[in-house]
Swiss-Prot record:
Biological classification of the source: Bacteria, Pseudomonadati, Pseudomonadota, Gammaproteobacteria, Enterobacterales
CDD domains: AdoMet_MTases, Methyltransferase_Sun
Record-linked InterPro entries: MeTrfase_RsmB-F_NOP2_cat, MeTrfase_RsmB-F_NOP2_dom, NusB-like_sf, NusB_RsmB_TIM44, RCMT, rRNA_ssu_MeTfrase_B, rRNA_ssu_MeTfrase_B_ent, RsmB-like_ferredoxin
Active site: 375
NCBIfam families (UniProt xref): PRK10901.1 (NF008149), PRK14902.1 (NF011494), rsmB (TIGR00563)
Chief subcellular location: cytoplasm
EC number: 2.1.1.176
Top-level taxon of the source organism: Bacteria
Reactions mediated catalytically: cytidine(967) in 16S rRNA + S-adenosyl-L-methionine = 5-methylcytidine(967) in 16S rRNA + S-adenosyl-L-homocysteine + H(+)
An example Gene Ontology CC term for this record: cytosol
Annotated protein name in UniProt: Ribosomal RNA small subunit methyltransferase B
PANTHER family: NOL1_NOP2_SUN FAMILY PROTEIN _ ANTITERMINATION NUSB DOMAIN-CONTAINING PROTEIN, NOP2 YEAST -RELATED NOL1/NOP2/FMU SUN DOMAIN-CONTAINING
PROSITE patterns assigned: NOL1_NOP2_SUN, SAM_MT_RSMB_NOP
């Protein structure tokens, strides 16, 4: 019989890899979950996501509770204590069990000599919890965001930054996209009801359904047969502006993992779609999504800055550019973003977006539509990016989304329960 793994130590090591090594939790967590029993998968995910969501608070508390930070080979213990604090603050796990399992985690990370230290710090927190939390709630750390990002949000949204931060710190709802080639949304909602679950239609996006309670995908009616796809409502909004038509040649650039590629084909099943992404590994998910939905598209690996390398001189009727960005609009869904991103990344990403826009524009037919989209809330990547593009591109015209002075449509996190997202619809004169 396989020895029971210590979930607390696994969570601590995963968070350490995110914060100290810059690895994405999306890459780290799935292989870890394969190592634990089905009943423990959800708890492992909760511990990892929860610690990353509240990292500022947990770090602040440790600095108050310990005279010196844990460094070097003992650094993992710092994150193990974070996991312990998170359980005491945010879970229903009985405190004695949370303490015992966290202390035992020291053995799993080969630091058994520090069991007493871990136990002492966590018990000290229990004794001082009320006064520590009162002090924390009066500090800037209470916003649970790195200071550089907080400053950018305050500058860009002087009236709204607090609501953005609050939305980022919430657990996200689960949004689905009903495949209209199989069922109407109303029909699928009836099937969902028959399966004992409840969903709510989005007022503006015709395929979007929000589950009352998140559920595993295998429990959703027809998921394996392509009847429904997990996709946030704001991401589904891209199709409102792209408006793909049958018979058109359409490019989905920066396409992985393929959610928007398949949405194009649901709306326009007879469109000729080319899906391109620079990341060959992530392209495998585009193939997986196409296969599950029984769809066909031309899938290519390529760099958006050099389109002639993968499409020659070909032009398209419509282009969806879901540009690489800071992902500051989806922090509630991916809390590791707060700790993976740095302030210096923003101008670098804006430059990359600018290069891709300039490179792909000649591949749009005259009269064609390009939708520029990001899951960012930062103006440098969004309205300012499009404003600069319009100023230097004589044959580009903004359509339906904003004004030349304030181009694009910005959805903020939590608005209509969707992610933060930006769209700009451009027409080639």
């Amino acid at each position: 019989m396989k020895k029971q793994r210590n979930l607390r130590s696994m969570a601590a090591q995963a968070v350490e890899q995110v914060v100290e090594q810059g690895q994405s939790l999306s890459n780290i967590l799935p292989p870890l979950q394969q190592k634990v029993s089905d009943k423990d998968k959800a708890l492992l995910q909760e511990l990892c996501f929860g610690v990353l969501r509240t990292l500022s608070q947990l770090d602040w508390l440790i600095n108050k509770l310990m005279a010196r930070p844990m460094t070097g080979k003992q650094r993992t213990v710092h994150y193990l204590i974070m996991v312990g604090l998170y359980q005491l603050l945010y879970t229903r796990i009985p405190p004695h069990a949370a303490l015992a399992e966290t202390v035992e985690g020291a053995i799993a990370i080969k630091r058994p000599q520090l069991k007493g230290l871990i136990n002492g710090v966590l018990r000290q927190f229990q004794r001082q919890q009320e006064e520590l939390l009162a002090e924390f709630n009066a500090s800037d750390a209470r916003y649970l965001h790195p200071s550089w990002l907080l400053k950018r949000l305050q500058k860009a949204y002087p009236e709204q930054w607090q609501s953005i931060v609050e939305a980022n710190n919430q657990r996200p709802p689960m949004w689905l996209r009903v495949n209209r080639t199989h069922h109407s949304r109303d029909r699928w909602l009836a099937l969902l009801d028959e399966a004992g679950m409840k969903g709510f239609p989005h007022a503006d996006y015709p395929d979007a359904v929000r589950l009352e309670t998140p559920a595993p995908v295998h429990a959703l009616p027809g998921f394996e047969d392509g009847w429904v796809t997990v996709q946030d409502a704001s991401a589904q909004g891209c199709m409102t502006w792209l408006a793909p038509q049958n018979g058109e040649h359409i490019l989905d650039l920066c396409a992985a993992p393929g959610g928007k590629t398949t949405h194009i084909l649901e709306v326009a099943p007879e469109a000729q779609v080319v899906a391109v992404d620079i990341d060959e590994q992530r392209l495998s998910r585009v193939y997986d999504n196409l296969k599950r939905l029984g769809m066909k598209a031309t899938v290519k690996q390529g760099d958006g800055r050099y389109p002639s390398q993968w499409c020659g001189e070909q032009q398209f009727d419509r282009i969806l550019l879901d540009a690489p960005c800071s992902a500051t609009g989806v922090i509630r869904r991916h809390p590791d973003i707060k700790w993976l991103r740095r302030d210096r990344d923003i101008p670098e990403l804006a430059q990359l977006q600018s290069e891709i826009l300039d490179a792909i524009w000649p591949h749009l037919k005259s009269g064609g539509t390009l939708v520029y989209a990001t899951c960012s809330v930062l103006p440098e990547e969004n309205s300012l990016q499009i404003k600069a593009f319009l100023q230097r591109t004589a044959d580009a015209e903004l359509c339906e989304t904003g004004t030349p002075e304030q181009p694009g449509k910005q959805n903020l996190p939590g608005a209509e329960e969707g992610d933060g997202f930006f769209y700009a619809k451009l027409i080639k004169k």
